[in-house]
Amino acid sequence: MALSFGYLQRDNSFKKDSQECETPRIRKTPVNMYLEKTLSFKDLVDQRNNYRDGNCGVKTRKGINLKGPKPDNMILDRSLSFTSLVQVENRGGEEEDERGSSPKRRNRGNLTALSLPAPTPFWSPRPSTELDAAAVTLQKVYKSYRTRRNLADCAVVVEELWWKELELAKLEPNKTNDKPESAVSRWARAGTKAAKVGKGLLKDDKAQKLALRHWLEAIDPRHRYGHNLHLYYDVWSESESTQPFFFWLDIGDGKEVNLNKCSRTLLQRQCITYLGPKERQAYEVVVEDGKLVSRQTKSLVETTEGTKWIFVLSTTRKLYIGQKQKGRFQHSSFLSGAAITAAGRIVSHDGVVKAVWPYSGHYLPTEENFREFICFLRENHVNLTNVKMNAIDDDDHLVNNDGSTKPSMMVAKSDGSDEQKRFSCKWSTGNGPRIGCVRDYPMDLQTRALEQVNLSPRVVNGTMGLFGPIPSPRPSPKIRVSPRLSCMGLPSPRH
């Protein structure tokens, strides 16, 4: 804390501390006597003898004589601040030289002010305009990620609001009929209400959408592996947190949660790669003379033995083939989570198809999807006589209680087909992932969801306190975005 003092001259004018003047005398009164004893002027005089009052700010004319009838006043000649802290240097020989020098020189001669080191200027060989552009780009990337995280939470909230509306609709009695309403009638009424406000997303009815269990992966800005995300999603659903899921997971109350089944390190490390339009061109494959050829390099497709290679047939009849890397590159990588016509595994040697089967944990293809892919190969004159089509994928097959194994295609047919008919997931476009699914809900639910995550806050009277995000609704512990929804039999807003 800096203290600055001046003093009054004999003509009652204020003299600044940077000028020299004669020491005024103040009449000795009981008040002055009390102040002199209280402030302990003798201690200040001792400090003057030890530190040579150059920059200390204590300066006397004739000394302070408390016994005399008219003691001289003490003059604080400089302001006391952090920058005026001093240390004594070269006290020996310089004292004699300074005794004969001027008062101004004595004040500056033997003491060196302690000052903070000057900041080192940042230097870069790049021009300042380029550095400014880089800073703006970094800010845009961070803001984009924050916005996409909020939109992902918005998608979760609007899904919950949708199920809440359906729950209220099925419990609402029929006002036009006095007879008790049957369960079938209630479900039919809920489906009718859903059909009025819902709309389809894809023109191709045979297209297979991304499985619901990987929905969180698609809308996650980091595209963390959907299976891992659902483990944390279950913890969030069972908690009493009022924060949206992704906010809770990354920076909210759940940022310290670390599960044994999936550690936080594994969750952050296993992020699925989502290809853009230019990136996926390296994986596009065409059929020439019945053989699989890379469209970009014109080389025959050769799947390395001991590794797993996967394929995806888009709704525009484009084939993509690449090597599977668990937790990094999977079926959803090719089209950034968009709908597909067929997906599965493939084995090819020198461009000749040796084996193909429809196993995909992300898309859960059905027999109909597999037939579409077989028709695609036949249309391009691929010889399927010796092609193996009934292999078992060790990652996706299930073991029943009796010990027998069934391929995941049969599981998809029994459990996933109804799920896929009810849910369509247009999570992305050709330019990359986006949250377009929010537009498939009624406008009032969209508005409420945006308000919940504070992306479009409602104007209210008074100031809004900054206490984190608005609570996310949970109509029922059983109603949430998880694989359990596939067994509920409720209609989807997008079907």
Curated annotation (Swiss-Prot):
Induction field: Down-regulated by salt stress and treatment with mannitol.
Disordered: region residues: 89-122
Cellular compartments annotated: Cytoplasm; Nucleus
Major subcellular location class: cytoplasm
Keywords: Cytoplasm, Nucleus
Gene Ontology cellular component terms for the protein in this record: cytoplasm; nucleus
Tissue spec: Expressed in roots, rosette and cauline leaves, and at lower levels in stems, flowers and siliques.
Chain ranges of the IQ domain: 131-160
PANTHER family: IQ DOMAIN-CONTAINING PROTEIN IQM3, IQ DOMAIN-CONTAINING PROTEIN IQM5
Cited function: May be involved in biotic and abiotic stress responses.
Protein name, as recorded: IQ domain-containing protein IQM5
Gene source species: Arabidopsis thaliana (Mouse-ear cress)
